[in-house]
């Protein structure tokens, strides 16, 4: 074994080659010059260190297994020289073991040329790698003490600090460059996408504007065509163009209603008025000339006035009916007994005739006054209410013949009471009509409903009847 080692060393000296260490890796590293402390002036520092380490006599064969100990930073498990002696005591020195360890010296030639990966390994992490490349078994590494391990770690960290920093900077710069280039590429693609989106939006806006212009132009053409068609169709219907505009609503209206609406602007029937109003409202936006606008406004005003008149009559009727009912209720409760003598003084000649008839009634039937006042008031109120309804609401004028027939059927006492109460009620209603005529604007609807003239006619008829009855009584007395 010693001869084999000596032969290798002699060949290395002759060829100036050190096969016991990774010479190619260490020589290429830039930190090797700064990290080396023990180096002679000669260029072959490996052999000097090798001769120094091989000077130990008894353990020469074991020291040849690790001839790469030129400095402390090359091996992470390097400790004091005493530690190597302790390690070698436990290892078995045999020929096949030495041959396997010598074969391991050729393996570092395949390892990559960057030594930073080995320097960055943690303490104790290169145990399996050192077994393959450096030939130190796992059993021998466990013998190292903790103090020796810490000391070797501190030396390795001090020697390889600059090399590790430089290696980290060298490795981070290219990776950062790759990341920045990828980011720049993605940024450029995003900008291109945004530009494409903006161009699409502008194209769509231009397209919408073009479509709107086409729509307005076609709408104008359609309006002109409708006017032309209406001008061609007007002579067939014998109606002027200004009274009617061509529209789909107008097409749905029958020909009869169209001619009626064109010929008669305002119809009395309530069914044709809504049709005419709807036709005018639809054609109001499509007027041809200002004359049409004026005519349509006049028609609208006339229709509004007709609607007001239609609503004013029922309101007046309801108002009058309410007042009559209230008056009759007051009469039944004897609220206006104190005012019963006033109408007779104001009437003049009709009251004198009624007084004469009342005096004759007192002379002929003295027992009739013995009736209860409640029965007389109820009967008078009922008959006056019926007469008011007939005269005011229904507008029926009683003829003299019918009055004569009803007077013949009734008793003379009952007849005189009825005539007397009818005169009083008609006089009160006429006074109310005069008060409403002279009152505020709330009685305008009552003035439109002509009830006073009807009651005056009824009073004239009643006066003639009373005159005839007075003459009859005088003839009987004679």
From Swiss-Prot:
This protein's record includes keyword Cytoplasm? yes
Bias (Polar residues) occurs at 260-290, 335-362, 371-380
Q: List compositional bias (Basic and acidic residues) regions by residue number.
A: 293-304, 406-424
- Keywords associated with the record: Coiled coil, Cytoplasm, Phosphoprotein
Q: What is its main location?
A: cytoplasm
Q: Where is this region: Disordered?
A: 32-62, 255-309, 335-380, 403-478
Query: What InterPro entries has UniProt attached to this entry?
Result: Tda11 (IPR031388)
Compartments annotated for it: namely:
Cytoplasm
According to its UniProt record, which protein family does this protein belong to?
Answer: Belongs to the TDA11 family.
The molecule here is called Topoisomerase I damage affected protein 11
Species of origin reads: Saccharomyces cerevisiae (strain FostersO)
């Amino acid at each position: 074994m010693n001869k084999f080692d000596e032969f290798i060393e002699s060949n290395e000296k002759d060829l100036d080659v050190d096969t016991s260490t990774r010479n190619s890796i260490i020589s290429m590293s830039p930190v090797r010059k700064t990290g080396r402390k023990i180096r002679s002036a000669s260029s072959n520092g490996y052999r000097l260190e090798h001769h120094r380490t091989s000077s130990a006599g008894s353990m020469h064969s074991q020291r040849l297994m690790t001839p790469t100990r030129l400095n402390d930073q090359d091996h992470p498990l390097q400790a004091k020289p005493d530690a190597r002696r302790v390690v070698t005591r436990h290892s078995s020195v045999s020929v096949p073991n030495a041959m396997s360890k010598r074969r391991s010296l050729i393996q570092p030639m395949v390892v990559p040329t960057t030594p930073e990966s080995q320097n960055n390994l943690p303490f104790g992490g290169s145990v399996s790698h050192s077994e393959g490349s450096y030939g130190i078994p796992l059993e021998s590494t466990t013998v190292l003490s903790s103090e020796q391990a810490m000391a070797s770690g501190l030396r390795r960290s001090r020697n390889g600090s600059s090399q590790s920093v430089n290696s980290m900077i060298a490795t981070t710069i290219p990776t950062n460059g790759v990341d920045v280039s990828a980011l720049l590429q993605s940024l450029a693609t995003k900008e291109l996408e945004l530009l494409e989106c903006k161009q699409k939006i502008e194209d769509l806006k231009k397209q919408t504007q073009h479509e709107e212009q086409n729509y307005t132009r076609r709408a104008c053409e359609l309006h002109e065509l409708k006017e032309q068609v209406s001008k061609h169709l007007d002579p067939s219907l014998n109606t002027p163009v200004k009274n009617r505009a061509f529209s789909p609503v107008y097409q749905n209206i029958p020909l009869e209603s169209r001619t009626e609406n064109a010929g008669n602007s305002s119809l009395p029937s309530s069914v044709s008025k809504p049709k005419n109003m709807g036709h005018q409202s639809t054609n109001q936006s499509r007027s041809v000339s200002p004359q049409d606008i004026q005519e349509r406004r006049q028609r609208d005003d006339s229709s509004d006035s007709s609607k007001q008149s239609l609503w004013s009559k029922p309101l007046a009727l309801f108002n009058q009916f309410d007042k009559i009912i209230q008056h009759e209720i007051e009469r039944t409760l004897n609220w206006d007994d104190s005012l019963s003598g006033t109408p007779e003084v104001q009437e003049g000649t009709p009251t004198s005739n009624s007084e004469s008839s009342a005096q004759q009634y007192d002379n002929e039937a003295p027992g009739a006054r013995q009736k209860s006042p409640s029965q007389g008031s109820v009967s008078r109120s009922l008959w006056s209410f019926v007469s008011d309804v007939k005269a005011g609401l229904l507008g029926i004028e009683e003829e003299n013949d019918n009055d004569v027939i009803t007077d013949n059927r009734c008793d003379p006492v009952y007849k005189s009471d009825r005539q007397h109460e009818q005169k009083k009620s008609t006089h009160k209603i006429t006074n109310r009509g005069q008060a409403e005529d002279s009152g505020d604007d709330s009685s305008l609807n009552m003035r439109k409903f002509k009830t006073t003239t009807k009651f005056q006619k009824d009073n004239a008829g009643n006066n003639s009847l009373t005159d005839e009855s007075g003459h009859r009584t005088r003839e009987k007395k004679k």
